């Protein structure tokens, strides 16, 4: 009888775990580019708009707690492009029950801006900028397994202006 109770309890816990995985919140990502005309030799601003389900947050890019997973936007850039700066939004405080210090989080909707430098000798044509968005979605009770979402920006680059 004890063995049966143990098996039922173990099965119930695994079912809860599987159920939580199927309900894992997903960030909706919208990549845009601020400039209409993009020329070699200039800077361009990439924008990633992130929308999370209601009552969901992600840790900031600079969490206060060393044990949480920060939100991170990274790139594998083609030759001729350089990331000059990534600007994350200001975080908000989120206090969990029984925690002394609030967590630094990004809530429901936020944007990340990236200043990208284009080499002056970059060939004209379409350029694809691939990125990865790492985040861990959490609600007020638990954090879900971290996810990495692929994102990309496509831009038509014109030749550099000659002086």
Language-model-derived ranges and their functions:
Residues 19-163:
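Extracellular/lumen-exposed scaffold segments
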Residues 1-2:
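N-terminal secretory signal peptides that target proteins for export/translocation
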Residues 5-15:
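Bacterial N-terminal signal peptides
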